[in-house]
Amino acid sequence: MAIRTGFCNPFLTQASGIKYNPRTGRGSNREFLHSYKTTMSSFQFLAPKCLDEDVPMEERKGVHVGTLSRPPKVYCNGKEVPILDFRCSSPWPRRVNIWGEIDFRGDKFDPRFNTFHVYDIVETTEAASNGDVSRFATATRPLGTVITLLGMSRCGKRVAVHVYGICQYFYINKAEVDTACGIRSGSELSVLLAECLRSSMITQNDATLNGDKNAFHGTSFKSASPESFRVEVIERTDVYYYDTQPCAFYRVYSPSSKFTNYLCDNFHPELKKYEGRVDATTRFLMDNPGFVSFGWYQLKPGVDGERVRVRPASRQLTLSDVEIDCMSDNLQAIPNDDSWPDYKLLCFDIECKSGGSNELAFPDATHLEDLVIQISCLLYSIPRQSLEHILLFSLGSCDLPQRYVQEMKDAGLPEPTVLEFDSEFELLIAFMTLVKQYAPEFATGYNIVNFDWAFIMEKLNSIYSLKLDGYGSINRGGLFKIWDVGKSGFQRRSKVKINGLISLDMYAIATEKLKLSSYKLDSVAREALNESKRDLPYKDIPGYYASGPNTRGIIGEYCIQDSALVGKLFFKYLPHLELSAVARLARITLTKAIYDGQQVRIYTCLLGLASSRGFILPDGGYPATFEYKDVIPDVGDVEEEMDEDESVSPTGTSSGRNVGYKGARVFDPDTGFYIDPVVVLDFASLYPSIIQAHNLCFTTLTLNFETVKRLNPSDYATFTVGGKRLFFVRSNVRESLLGVLLKDWLAMRKAIRARIPGSSSDEAVLLDKQQAAIKVVCNSVYGFTGVAQGFLPCLYVAATVTTIGRQMLLSTRDYIHNNWAAFERFITAFPDIESSVLSQKAYEVKVIYGDTDSVFIRFKGVSVEGIAKIGEKMAHIISTALFCPPIKLECEKTFIKLLLITKKKYIGVIYGGKVLMKGVDLVRKNNCQFINDYARKLVELLLYDDTVSRAAAEASCVSIAEWNRRAMPSGMAGFGRIIADAHRQITSPKLDINKFVMTAELSRPPSAYINRRLAHLTVYYKLVMRQGQIPNVRERIPYVIVAPTDEVEADAKSVALLRGDPLQNTAGKRCGEAKRKLIISDLAEDPIHVTSHGLSLNIDYYFSHLIGTASVTFKALFGNDTKLTERLLKRFIPETRVVNVKMLNRLQAAGFVCIHAPCWDNKMNTEAEITEEEQSHQIMRRVFCIPKAILHQS
């Protein structure tokens, strides 16, 4: 690496031309028309004192704070480079050619292009200047909304296309407005609307409101006039209810979203508004057939030959290569082109360090001394999936290990560029300048929404007072913001919205695509990529950072490695393809598809279809006035409605549902263990198919029988739901809008899937993501109607869907029992199975479980091979006999063995040998290895040992009352041996403590916990008390449970004082010192402390925990009674007697003889060995002979 020159620490040197004023605040900077920084003469200086290599070690604690009077700079390859001076050679790649007020494109630059791709859409508000007489000024006088399409031309230019003339509009019932306001025409309504705006509080107080933005709106509201609005009278129908008649509505066109939003809230709030919350972007996409939110467009002359206008650099809103102004008639969408231009991906990761008295504390962005010390940035080409640049931003000098640099070179990767900075602000302003100058279209990382972006934004806002509104695509007044940032690290989802920069967090993708006990990056990389990372514990970072450039290079390697793993995850799962397909299908922006949930996807689609058929959508819908007990709050049960082999989940946050629906439970499962074949029939796309088959919709529903009694009985269906009779007309009377959407989407999905086999590998991936996106949207339709506070709730429809689903399951059960219970009728229906009959006498068929969309059918007396062969025929016969298309049953799987535990919880072996589990976690991250290992052993024995399986099936048929006088089936001996072995291991004096370590995540600071008497918090406080290494937020704290001793009790008292919750004294029955009552969490201890101090583990706790864990899983064998299961499993434990050796010796010395006691060596005082054969004999005698009473366990 080149030798650095001029590496400046202002606290050690006074370089020429640089004036340093400690703690004098920020220098004043010149304000430009853009808010991103292009020049700075001074800035706040924050840097760790550990970088001061020329001062004594004892003086290197803490952080330098002050103001540095010079422009920010960066050191790269030994050279000093100004960060903000665009004329200087840049240490990072640039894609912009305009910076500040200077245009670097050159005279030969040709702005022309014809076709362009759109990836993001931004709404801005514009007010025309007085001298402008263009058609674009007319559209923004006094105020207008402009839609900006951001993307790239076919020829590679980054473009921004500003679309004028897009008006929001809303509807309001004419008769109601005329009555309320005493008017009769649209012109009179325009006058009232303008008066409402001019008299608004914003207008009256614009001089005192916070900031220019409100003042601007106040000025524009003052200038509102009747001419600002266009009002039409039009006939439309409310989408709610079949008996709603068409009537006259005022359609009010407003040039500004600010006008529309204010009027919908404040102009006669008691009057219902329709579609007032539909934004201008949605109107642009919906009112122009074929327009897409993500895809290709081409430019064309307008209806009257009007042409587009190229903006000069001085008027550009962004730093795009070209900006043009146009109207919507200058645009034409290009269908069936799924190609992507050369969009760029920024993959980044930050490393932080606390600079306070405790360097191991978790960094807080609001603390001035907690610093970002490194940022790794990997820059990719998305369509080529190639890594193009590697950058490492480092606070202080940094030398990457030569080994690592050579490894990257050997792998054919770009050589990392190391950028070094004197202060944190220079590092952060350089990173933000890279974001602005390189202008990547997409960004990713691991937990960047909750941590990396949040930390950077908070630090720049609260510590450095740097506005970020100009660092997205928009140069000033843009969006660069995070909502709902959670303080509990990984536990909460937030939203990040940056104009022109789509953030896809791979942590969110990993939690939806993978089912793991831990979602740390290392765990995800092992599972998804079969790679592991070189871990660097957070506790080591302060020491590495303070030790010089070589060890800082180790941190840099770690930082780059994390970004590289995330980049590989991105191109493995390709979330951008699936989400862009969702955005295109739902006609919403990509950012909305990621962060705004399911509701908006269905709403926009329904809006377009409703509009084409003369319906309008009321804001907020209408509340349902009934209770439906079978409709249970839930969010997650509709994902299973389509083919299981295509497990695709929507990305991003949930839809914000506070009320949802779960498939109605029809009958409780017949719990137990089955060794007869159990076939599972599933309804394909249950809820979408019910909506289609029964024509359910807002528009086909009526609550009034008088409305339908004039129709033929075959023209409507009646359902009783929650005590109300609901009527839905058939499709020949009025077609369901929801049904039409589903029919079109499913037909589209089928066509796309048919194209996949004949496509190239790249095209097949894209098509697969498209069909998956359709599946996601289809599965959202049912939930859309069932959210009470949603966009357009209709609980009647949602409740009817679950009612029909319940009836379908009941009718399926009755059909099976009525038609196939008799062996002769079963053979008649399935003559091919006669050769697979094992015993005609033993033949029996029974539906043992039915829930949501599945029916579990047990067959006795027929081989599993035979049942597996007729499964599809069985499904077809039932579907044809009972249901109308598109409802159909499919044979999903056939179990060879099945442990049916409770509703939605089972474990089984399906035909073919694969183990399938639902709702059961054999290996839980909160359990120790000992418990997980034995729980797994017990399940594997149950499923794979035929002797144990038969015995378990026998046991599951025994009633609860019989077990007090009944022995275990002899075949359960193997089960007992495993439990006895577990007991032997845990009572052995040579325990491996590592097998008993449990962990729990410190999800927030201890002070933020309501209940602090938790095991991992106990260990946290003990480490504080012993001045050990303190865990940080998001770290998992290991602990074990120890036996209660005087030392443990003393520690518990100290911990109670530390957490501010002293243990209460409870006086005993006798006089003397009061005893403190300890709970399990008080017995938690640091494993290292246990090992070093020879503390004993709490054997009773661990074995009880194992028995408890096993009982939850195996209670289905014993009548689903957990307590009974625990008692029965304890029968397998060898009975032991605790012998008081001192007392035994005293009694023997007094002449007493020990009878039935173990053999003891009085000299060694140790228990003699019992042979394994004798021990097994004792176990079997105890378990399989009927005891007179439940044996006492010590």
Curated annotation (Swiss-Prot):
The keyword Lipid biosynthesis does not apply. GO terms for biological process: DNA-templated DNA replication; viral DNA genome replication. It comes from the Viruses. Its main location: host cell. It catalyses: DNA(n) + a 2'-deoxyribonucleoside 5'-triphosphate = DNA(n+1) + diphosphate; Endonucleolytic cleavage to 5'-phosphomonoester. GO terms for molecular function: DNA binding; DNA-directed DNA polymerase activity; nucleotide binding; RNA-DNA hybrid ribonuclease activity. One of its GO terms (cellular component) is host cell nucleus. It is found in: Host nucleus. Its EC number is 2.7.7.7, 3.1.26.4. Keywords: DNA replication, DNA-binding, DNA-directed DNA polymerase, Endonuclease, Host nucleus, Hydrolase, Multifunctional enzyme, Nuclease, Nucleotidyltransferase, Transferase, Viral DNA replication. The keyword Protein biosynthesis does not apply. Forms a complex with the ssDNA-binding protein, the DNA polymerase processivity factor, and the alkaline exonuclease. Interacts with the helicase-primase complex composed of the primase, the helicase and the primase-associated factor; this interaction may coordinate leading and lagging strand DNA synthesis at the replication fork. Replicates viral genomic DNA. The replication complex is composed of six viral proteins: the DNA polymerase, processivity factor, primase, primase-associated factor, helicase, and ssDNA-binding protein. Additionally, the polymerase contains an intrinsic ribonuclease H (RNase H) activity that specifically degrades RNA/DNA heteroduplexes or duplex DNA substrates in the 5' to 3' direction. Therefore, it can catalyze the excision of the RNA primers that initiate the synthesis of Okazaki fragments at a replication fork during viral DNA replication. Belongs to the DNA polymerase type-B family. This is DNA polymerase catalytic subunit. It comes from Varicella-zoster virus (strain Dumas). The lineage of its organism: Viruses, Duplodnaviria, Heunggongvirae, Peploviricota, Herviviricetes.
